[in-house]
Amino acid sequence: MNIKRAKEEIEHTVKAYLAKDALGEYAIPAIRQRPILLMGPPGIGKTQVMEQVARECGVALVAYTITHHTRQSAVGLPFIRQRNYGGKDVSVTEYTMSEIIASIYAKMEATGLSEGILFIDEINCVSETLAPTMLQFLQCKTFGNQAVPAGWVIVAAGNPPEYNKSVRDFDIVTLDRVRRMDIEPDLPVWKDYACAAHIHSAILSYLELHPQNFYQINADVDGTQFVTARGWEDLSNLLDTYETLGLQADEDLIREYIQHPKIAEDFSAYLDLYYKYRDDYGVEEILAGQAKPAVFARLLQAPFDERLSLVSLILAGLGTRFTASRQADAVADSCYAFLRETKKALATVPEDIPDGSAEMFHQQIMDYDTETQQKRAAGLLSKDALTTRLQVLAVLRGWEGELRRANAAGTQEAFDLLRGQFQSLADEREKAQQTASAALEAAFDFMEQAFAESQEMVVFVTELTVDPVSHAFLTENGCERYFKYNKDLLLDHRKAALQQELSAEQRRHGGV
């Protein structure tokens, strides 16, 4: 199965294992809660999926790469204790709590979450001395003499033997106690994630042209050459930062992430062209509705991959504006909800307390900050959600400063001042939405003039549809031409599907 299907199955499993009956007991007893065993090539996204599942289910996550541990850290350290058995004093060996089990309790204490996921990576690559401990863990859900706490779902991951020489096969007794999921790389599924994760547009357009280069692991006399989903994502983060700093990524740098010489060389050449197209075609001018006439003349002679790269650049420019609009929306919505609570709280502030409104507002901000830090520590905030909360805090602190400088005479005056501050924020949101909408209209103007209803327009509309950020913007704000082309695209798709069905029917009955 692909990683998206695996994520859905794990999410459903967590909900099922943590469901309780009318008496407050787990509906599925712990002994029947089979650990999940994910088997798949390295760098496919197993660890990230666990982070997403934990965040979306609102539970804690403790993740370990077991190859980093010894038997002592997994089982605990031995110590001698005096016991009396049958009237005879004896010395017996006991063990301290496993470091892994202790980490679960520490996570529970730090986050306030009593339920979670224990994720053990590379479980079938452990040393010979640790192998029996891992078998005991999967079969009995214990490390040494310490059981995994109730309410914690066990997920383990490993690599097939063709990807790791250290792999140890599990026996049938162990496999009969786990739920095994075999995961394979899947570019279309990864693209859904990549759009939401803001993977660099050059990488997405390159893989659109060369899908076979998404994931490869090849072994020859020179060693293992590979490229993984993790490599592309990590490279994307670096490219974004390099662009911000005005630095240039060369082939040597790309090889550090894409450890497949031919693919690294090919992508490096493509990246150079990508930046060249961005400058030559003037993408920002296109999105401002000021495309140069020479651009259209050049496109008439341009090969398909160059035209597709330009479409990708236009989509990337739109994506930046859509993201800014969405972020402005999220910040404004959060601040509005905050002000509603502020209005309620102000009603409880006595009018005769100096700076009472400002002090109350300050305490609200402190509470929001504390909540943010707690959720951050628990891993319950996505990158976008954390960014929104940090921006909200910055806005609220600015409002607090205005409130203190104004020295409002009463609670109503204080709230009127805050409401005025919010109106400025709402104006900024409206401006971001208008900027994005204007750029989208300019993009359609250019696409119609340059490509009409060709394959490039199909790609453009399709990418607007599948990208979650652009799709959310279009759903919220609309665009007449997008809906027109999208409708035509759906009709063409249905006609093509119907034609295929008719052709298949004719072959069956006509002997063609």
Predicted regions, residues:
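Conserved, well-structured beta-alpha core segment at the onset of a catalytic domain
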Residues: 25-34, 43-46, 242-257, 512
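AAA+ P-loop NTPase catalytic core and its hallmark functional loops
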Residues: 1-212, 217-220
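Generic hydrophobic, helix-prone segments enriched in Leu/Val/Ile
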Residues: 10, 100-104, 242, 433-443
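Terminal-proximal interaction/regulatory segments of ATP-powered molecular machines
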Residues: 300-512
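Alpha-helical lid/collar subdomain of P-loop NTPases
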Residues: 196-355, 359
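Alpha-helix capping and helix-coil boundary motifs
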Residues: 2, 184-186, 243, 303-304, ...
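Charged/polar, solvent-exposed surface patches and flexible loops
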Residues: 8, 12, 16, 55, ...
